[in-house]
Amino acid sequence: MMPKHCFLGFLISFFLTGVAGTQSTHESLKPQRVQFQSRNFHNILQWQPGRALTGNSSVYFVQYKIMFSCSMKSSHQKPSGCWQHISCNFPGCRTLAKYGQRQWKNKEDCWGTQELSCDLTSETSDIQEPYYGRVRAASAGSYSEWSMTPRFTPWWETKIDPPVMNITQVNGSLLVILHAPNLPYRYQKEKNVSIEDYYELLYRVFIINNSLEKEQKVYEGAHRAVEIEALTPHSSYCVVAEIYQPMLDRRSQRSEERCVEIP
């Protein structure tokens, strides 16, 4: 017969081994590289499977929360130390009643999803406020711990697309019309909201003389209509543009080249 102290030691060892094994399993299920990817305020939460997961053997659960660094004095007052960022009447704005919200909320469309991403654009539309997202995985009846994103503030972190260009030839010159990217919000009259409503933007226009293989910046400013003059007849030119955000010292990628022949 096994002595009592040996049997007790066996039970303790068995229990600790089981706990360690369970913790190891949970850790290996935990989603990796959980982060927001944002373009033009389309805010997508993305992640990678845990080390133990392959294929479609698991499902994921997504939560999010907004973190305001202020507190409400009363339900009728603006939070102390806070300020209203934007005065507008389209769905991208939130009322002051939203200030102070800190609870994790389920994203119903991504609750039990097999995808590795979740669109949180609508849930993160207070663009100057910080957010967090988190994801947990489940497989074969086991659940991982939550894996959380770094702090995400859309206004600071979204990347904007290059401008859309329309080019028209006018008496040997080129008239370039630039359009800033639209956002996923709309005004009440169904008018698209532009990135210009949120940032000071400068447009940069470059022209390339194909015969000389030489690029020249011909414009930098806030106007969206740019005329390029003094072009050489019977020559080929290409035009590209980008957007620069002075406050963030950040620029977009360049647009696709648009090429024309000057008669």
Curated annotation (Swiss-Prot):
GO terms for cellular component: cytosol; extracellular region; extracellular space; plasma membrane. Keywords: Disulfide bond, Glycoprotein, Receptor, Repeat, Secreted, Signal. InterPro entries: FN3_dom, FN3_sf, Ig-like_fold, Interferon/interleukin_rcp_dom, Type-II_Cytokine-TF_Rcpt. SUPFAM superfamilies: Fibronectin type III. GO terms for molecular function: cytokine receptor activity; interleukin-22 binding; interleukin-22 receptor activity. Glycans are attached at N56, N166, N171, N192, N209. Expressed in placenta, spleen, breast, skin and lung. Also detected in intestinal tract, testis, brain, heart and thymus. No expression found in prostate, bladder, kidney, ovary, muscle, bone marrow, liver and uterus. Isoform 1 is expressed only in placenta. Isoform 2 is expressed in placenta and breast and at lower level in spleen, skin, thymus and stomach. The record marks Y99, R151 as: Critical for IL22-binding. Residues 1-21 form the signal peptide. It is found in: Secreted. The keyword Disulfide bond applies. It comes from the Eukaryota. Disulfide bonds join C110-C118, C238-C259. Residues 26-68, 100-161, 162-263 form the Fibronectin type-III domain. GO terms for biological process: cytokine-mediated signaling pathway; negative regulation of inflammatory response. Its main location: secreted. Belongs to the type II cytokine receptor family. Isoform 2 is a receptor for IL22. Binds to IL22, prevents interaction with the functional IL-22R complex and blocks the activity of IL22 (in vitro). May play an important role as an IL22 antagonist in the regulation of inflammatory responses. Isoform 1 may play a role in establishing and maintaining successful pregnancy. This is Interleukin-22 receptor subunit alpha-2. It comes from Homo sapiens (Human). The lineage of its organism: Eukaryota, Metazoa, Chordata, Craniata, Vertebrata.
